[in-house]
């Protein structure tokens, strides 16, 4: 009898331990691969805070009777390191999906890797249109606007201006060329008589852009399309301001109205630069955006930037998709994510099924100093709905080699 009781006790303990272990394994695990060192870290950390803010609410209720947890890896803005970290997240950490990435080249490399591993990957900052365009596949998604969308927005805006002779200048890497190609392609389609009279390309992070600006100004174009971002954006805006370029030549730069760039620049930021942006903490002036900004400000002491916005909606898409899937299963998760809709600070966002690209708006404005703020902001904002600036599903099919 004692042996039977002891055996029963041991079996009970084993069952409890097994149950605890199974429950532990069933936690939804997200691997965040982003840049947390060097100048781009400001974007990586902002995104991380947006993701954490969303998880704080999501995990109060839970998803599938469990919680979403995450682990981070720093890609150091380098392709080889990013790819190595992605492999570590998949093979060592056993994550259910990967999110993140700023560097477009890193995003493309990781996308190619996860395709073979059949692990979902959601890009939330990287903007190359190849991610959900010609290089897109079942396992990759994007909650960021991409270069096609930004380029079309810029093309639409510039096509309504009287400018004919253009100069293109920017960062000599994937993002720079992608945004330039998209802007010019769309502008040329809408206004065939425009001419490209010259181009200037510099290495990413080039500290002195004044020689380039001086040469461009001397060429006397009617307008300039800048294809730059990150640290180069700061240097470009400084050079534009110090040379007075924006007072002489109209300029369009995607993300020129980014608060993360304009606020630190202060008086060094130029006025009169046209820019498109995917998120502003001060626009739209709606209850949903105000609530998001207040929650973020209370938690982290500063307003959210565009990375926080994208990471925030990414978290909610993940939660709703797993809930719809009904299980922690990668294939079911992907099926559920396709066509998923979530409310966001800028309105409803849909994950389009045909290309796994989030449908969200862009905001076109002009840099200007206003009395309400002690830094330059975007003014005269026009909202461009996502559906109006995205490629059609038929175009995506053709880009991927479909008939």
Regions found by a protein language model. Give the residues of each.
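Periplasmic-binding protein-like
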Residues: 89-102, 122-124, 167-170, 220-230, ...
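Short, polar/charged alpha-helical segment
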Residues: 43-64, 182-189
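Beta-alpha junction/loop-to-helix N-cap segments that form part of ligand/metal-binding clefts
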Residues: 42-47, 61-133, 143, 201-209, ...
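Bacterial N-terminal signal peptides
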Residues: 8-18
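Extracellular/periplasmic periplasmic-binding protein-like sensory domains
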Residues: 237-312, 322-328, 367, 371, ...
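Sec/Tat signal peptide C-region and signal peptidase I cleavage site
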Residues: 18-24
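Extracellular/periplasmic Venus flytrap/periplasmic-binding protein
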Residues: 84, 129-132, 137-243, 282-291
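Extracytoplasmic "Venus flytrap"
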Residues: 31-52, 73-80, 102-103, 169-177, ...
